[in-house]
Curated annotation (Swiss-Prot):
Name this protein carries in UniProt: Chimallin
Function: Self-assembles to form a proteinaceous shell that encloses the viral DNA and compartmentalizes proteins and DNA during viral infection. This micrometer-scale compartment contains narrow pores and is the site of viral replication, with the proteins involved in DNA replication localized inside. Provides a surface for docking of capsids during packaging. Probably protects the viral genome against host defenses.
Residues annotated as signal peptide: none
Region (Disordered) residue spans: 1-33
Organism: Pseudomonas phage PhiPA3
Lineage of origin: Viruses, Duplodnaviria, Heunggongvirae, Uroviricota, Caudoviricetes
Subunit and partners: Homotetramer. The tetrameric protomers further assemble as a square grid.
Keyword terms of this UniProt record: Host cytoplasm
Top-level taxon in the UniProt lineage: Viruses
Positions with biased composition (Low complexity): 1-14
GO CC, any one term: host cell cytoplasm
Length: 602
């Protein structure tokens, strides 16, 4: 008897969401509309690199790479998704690192914003960027796409930290992309290990009997580079190294790597007006203070190349080493004049424009001595620095730095603070509450303005970090035109002006001062560290018996009064807090990603 072939079973579905949902309802295998060609090209490259890495035993064959197409998922930009799966305590867990791919061939709709302009409201249009595209809806659609492609419809999807492959990146640079793939898989492993109950890193793991730890400061001023080769300003590089004691050998015929981690930073001289007299009573400050406050801006935190893990505990330990630039006021060495550079945005002599002299101090001659340098800084720069971090939602540490961004404020703040404190307690073995009360004090506060990240081309055609245009850079670029310089400075921190207007005006100054080669990749949230948290972290690590020697710290100012303090605890906390409050606005621009349950980081 001949069997009757049955046709496909027809299911009645209710059309919801309009015509845009038709492909979700009537799903088919193939497509002819092409989609995002750049994302398709990237997928082919990554699949090739995946096969090579597995064949060369650089990676295990236990991960996937999916394309998240903008047309299919109705989002602003396509992405590649590096995916790892595991069953943890009976729960299907999927971790992904989204590699978002902006495309110059795709024009995003502009953002329409209503702003207050005096007594009136007006609507302005602003260009959308990657941060605008990567919303909670975008993340939720990534989760739906992964569940569909893996067939794990009930799986928990965790975010290993998104990054951006900029539109101008050459997809033929396979060496860099292979390293990006390996790093992305390792970041997925970080999140799976955390969920699986892996023992967290602690400083107790470093207390070997045959070695010591030493911090080294490097002031070459050459930029570091991120995973894709884009420059990161690094006027000061603090590296932590393990040093074997004399006569000790760890391995026969093999020299182990000695570097543990490194932190990049630069000194931004924030203009700090004199405190005004209080409305009631005596003035808050009777002594005339220098007009500039040094802000140590941390731009990059990374583990040594040989160390593949990157966890909250490892990040905090590396971060703590940034504070060692306070030893003997070492941070000031990054401001020393560079002889031979004619057009120098970092010429410290430009701060003379803000002095009573109201003129540039000539620093490029042999007659400008170390004594002159010390006197210039003593008169113009306050001795105690503020510490800041540029936190990047799409950087190499995105999964960790998103937690610190959440700690700046918003609906996820409480969870973020708890995660940071838990990380510190893991690092030191518990008891951090003896050093810092996070219930009554913030860990970090918002600067109030997003920092545009990107690069420009210098005179030799080399890419340099856009953040070279800081307070000192703008003073030099404006040639002492204080009115123009103050207009630039307002685009950086005048919270009375809408952030989108500040960003637009800031980009105009970028083109004026840096040239038309300026290219933007994403934005960073600049946070100001609570000085009491800095002290507490430093003391807590020291309290568990970890001693770090300073390998190459020299006295910068000899016997001058501005010689500074030997440890961060010696700084006047109230003085630092005063600076912080002058820079922070409660109305600071801090857009929240991942409202409620949508972030995927926790």
């Amino acid at each position: 008897m001949q069997q009757t072939q049955q046709g496909p079973k027809v299911q009645t579905q209710t059309l919801q969401g309009g015509a845009g949902n038709l492909n979700s309802i009537f799903q088919r295998s193939g497509r002819t509309d092409g989609g995002d060609a750049r994302a398709s090209e990237a997928l082919a490259v990554f699949n090739k690199l995946k096969e090579e890495a597995i064949a060369q035993q650089d990676l295990h064959d236990d991960f996937l790479v999916f394309r998240f197409d903008r047309d299919q998922n109705r989002v602003g930009y396509s992405a590649l998704l590096v995916v790892k799966r595991a069953a943890i305590n009976g729960q299907q867990v999927i971790v992904t690192r989204p590699l978002v791919m902006p495309n110059d061939q795709i024009t995003l709709p502009t953002k329409k914003l209503t702003i207050q302009n005096g007594m009136h409201q007006e609507t302005i249009e602003a260009e959308a960027d990657v941060q605008d595209v990567f919303t909670t809806q975008y993340w939720n659609r990534i989760c739906d796409s992964i569940r569909q492609q893996t067939g794990k419809h009930d799986a928990m999807v965790i975010n290993a930290g998104p990054t951006v492959i900029p539109a101008d990146f050459d997809l033929k640079d396979e060496l860099v992309l292979k390293q990006l793939l390996i790093k992305s898989v390792n970041l997925c492993d970080d999140m799976l290990a955390k969920r699986s109950g892996e023992q967290p890193f602690s400083v107790a793991m470093l207390k070997g009997t045959d070695e010591t730890l030493a911090a080294r400061l490097n002031f070459t001023g050459k930029p570091m580079h991120d995973s894709l080769g884009y420059p990161i300003r690094s006027d000061i590089l603090v590296s932590l190294n393990r040093v074997k004691k004399p006569g000790q050998q760890e391995n026969e015929f093999y020299e182990a790597e000695d570097k543990l981690n490194q932190v990049s930073c630069f000194v931004n001289l924030e203009y700090t007006p004199q405190p005004q007299q209080a409305i009631y009573g005596a003035p808050q400050q009777t002594q005339q203070l220098p007009p500039l406050t040094p802000a140590i801006v941390i731009t990059d935190v990374r583990q040594a190349e040989w160390l593949k893990a990157n966890t909250m505990e490892l990040y905090l330990f590396a971060l703590s080493n940034a504070f060692r630039v306070t030893a003997n006021q070492s941070w000031a060495r990054s401001l020393l004049p560079q002889l031979g550079k004619v057009k120098d945005m970092r010429d410290i002599g430009a701060i003379g424009y803000l002095s009573r002299l109201a003129a540039r101090v000539e620093t490029k001659t042999e007659t400008f001595t170390d004594q002159n340098f010390a006197e210039l800084l003593y008169n113009m720069v306050r001795p105690s620095p503020v510490f800041m971090s540029d936190l990047n939602r799409f950087g190499d540490n995105a999964a960790i730095e998103n937690v610190f961004i959440d700690a700046l404020g918003g609906v996820n703040q409480q969870r973020a603070v708890a995660a940071i404190i838990a990380g510190v307690n893991n690092l030191i073995g518990g008891g951090f509450e003896k050093f810092f009360d996070h219930n009554t004090m913030p860990i970090i506060q918002p600067y109030g303005t997003d920092i545009q990240l990107g690069y420009y081309l210098d005179g030799e055609g080399e890419k340099q970090d856009r953040r070279d245009l800081d307070v000192l850079g703008a003073l030099n670029a404006s040639d002492g035109n204080i009115q123009e310089w103050m207009s630039w400075y307002g685009t950086q921190c005048n919270v009375a002006v809408h952030p989108e207007l500040r960003a637009r005006q800031s980009k105009n100054f970028d083109r004026q001062y840096l040239g038309n080669s300026v290219t933007y990749t994403t934005r960073a949230h600049r946070g100001i560290w609570n000085p009491k948290f800095i002290e507490a972290l430093d003391k807590a690590i020291a309290s568990v018996g970890l001693t770090v020697a300073m390998d190459n710290v020299a006295q910068v100012f000899g016997a001058q009064r501005f010689s500074g303090n030997l440890a961060i605890a010696d700084y006047a906390v109230t003085g630092t807090a005063q600076v912080s409050s002058g820079l922070v606005s409660n109305g600071g621009y801090n857009p929240q990603f991942g409202v409620g349950q949508g972030s995927g980081f926790y």
